[in-house]
Swiss-Prot record:
Transmembrane segments: none annotated. CDD domains: TOPRIM_recR (cd01025). Pfam families: RecR_C, RecR_HhH, Toprim_4. This is Recombination protein RecR. GO terms for molecular function: DNA binding; zinc ion binding. The gene is recR.
Length: 200
């Protein structure tokens, strides 16, 4: 049986690494790209190179920065340091920014606690978070994590970790769909959940 040329197989193997993309989808995308004008494929390749060379996260809050040399927009003095929003991913930050309801600072956790897989929070990030709270002394820490098993476990851990501090700890209001990622929640629903957040 004849196999795909190596350049097709290699592309398919990389595409399969993307979330939600299986072999069939990767195969379809690869052959769709064969129909593109070579200049379009080259432009996409350059965009990927620029992405690799330019993307950077802030070492203090772990939000995405505009470039490796730029300062962090989310750590600027224009943000309200009395409110600290804890999120799971840099993408979650932009979900809240679209809702235009939060003007405070963020902290991106990255990995969440997983009772099933035994995954733990990054000790390094946890120490940086503690330092951020010590430096800025926010009056409220808003735990804005997905309503999933991992999100709930992480929220409970954070509550226990910081309950001794004179800081209000809250979670997004009930009504957020259980098990659903912020990716699938519209800005209005997110804004209502944020404004109606409860003490945790």
């Amino acid at each position: 049986m004849l196999k795909y040329p190596d350049y097709i197989s290699k592309l398919i193997s990389f595409l399969k690494k993307l979330p939600g993309i299986g072999f069939k989808s990767a195969e379809k995308i690869a052959f769709e790209l064969l129909e593109w004008d070579p200049s379009q494929v080259e432009a996409m390749g350059l965009a990927m190179q620029e992405f690799s060379a330019s993307h950077a996260t802030c070492p203090d809050c772990f939000c995405l920065k505009t470039s490796k040399t730029s300062s962090c927009d989310f750590c600027s003095e224009s943000r309200d340091s009395s409110f600290l929003c804890i999120v799971a991913t840099p993408k979650d930050v932009f979900s809240f920014e679209k809702s235009k309801i939060f003007k405070g600072r963020y902290f991106v956790l990255g990995n969440l606690l997983s009772p099933i897989t035994g995954k733990h929070l990054s000790l390094e990030k946890l120490n940086i978070l503690k330092q951020r709270i010590e430096d800025f002394a926010p009056k409220e820490m808003i735990i804005a994590l997905d309503a999933t098993l991992e999100g709930d476990a992480t929220a409970l851990f954070l509550k226990q970790e910081f309950s001794h501090l004179p800081i209000k700890i809250s979670r997004l209001a009930l009504g957020m769909p259980v098990g659903l990622s912020f990716d699938f929640i519209d800005s209005n629903t997110l804004a209502r959940a944020f404004s109606g957040r409860n003490c945790f």
